[in-house]
């Protein structure tokens, strides 16, 4: 219950687990995972992947992942760095030769290999209870069914329109315009990617058709990413 004697947020207490995300639907899904017998790892993966649909201007499965966790009944703290490296063929000499003194933040040179999916797979396998398929199921459902866009997300989205290039404009704009607050947004193609991962594990993302599509898109932008880079994440 809200403590009206104090300003700001009240302290929250719970016996079996807590969830905090920036979107109520992500929090709800994570709680449902816990109620279904999952643990914090299962719930965190479910919420994180769903966030890529609810707030794609902030996060997504093409990004990285950093985790601190403490296994139940242990005082040990485990850290996992789920960030990807730069492609093997990228070097500073070529970047300077192209006229850059720093890595251009808006260029293909700044795109590293996505490490989040590899981290999620390892986390689920090593520390989860329900399995990766269960953790990905909520995001797959909502990517097909759609979600209403929150006001703050719509505001951020409108500021990022000029950053969208090529096919990204088809996937992240609605009739050429950013979605407004309350509009439904779906990502059926991303749902297919998650289904591949649910079926094949990390190989569904870092090998085969999905990896080939990412490499092709990056190469078309001038990137030096390769299939070997992805398979070696």
Task: Give each language-model segment a name.
Residues 1-32, 40-207, 211-233:
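Noncatalytic scaffold domains of N-terminal-nucleophile
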């Amino acid at each position: 219950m809200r403590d009206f004697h104090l300003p700001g947020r009240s302290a929250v207490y719970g016996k079996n687990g807590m969830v905090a995300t920036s979107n109520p639907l992500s929090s709800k899904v994570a709680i449902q995972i816990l109620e279904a017998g999952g643990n914090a790892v299962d719930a965190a993966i479910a919420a994180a992947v769903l966030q890529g649909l609810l707030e794609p201007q902030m996060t997504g499965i093409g990004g990285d992942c950093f985790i601190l966790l403490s296994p139940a009944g242990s005082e040990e703290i485990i850290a996992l760095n789920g960030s990807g490296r730069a492609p093997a063929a990228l070097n500073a000499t070529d970047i300077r030769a192209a006229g850059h003194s720093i890595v251009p933040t808006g260029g293909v040179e700044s795109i590293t290999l996505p490490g989040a999916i590899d981290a999620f797979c390892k986390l689920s396998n090593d520390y989860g209870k329900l399995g990766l398929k269960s953790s990905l199921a909520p995001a797959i459902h909502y990517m097909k069914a759609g979600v209403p866009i929150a006001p703050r997300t719509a505001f951020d989205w409108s500021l990022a329109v000029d950053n969208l290039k090529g096919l990204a404009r088809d996937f992240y704009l609605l009739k050429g315009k950013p979605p407004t607050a309350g509009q439904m947004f779906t990502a059926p193609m991303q749902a297919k990617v998650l289904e591949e991962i649910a079926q094949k594990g990390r190989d569904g993302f870092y090998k085969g058709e999905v990896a080939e599509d990412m490499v092709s898109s990056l190469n078309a932008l001038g990137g030096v990413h390769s299939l070997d880079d992805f398979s070696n994440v």
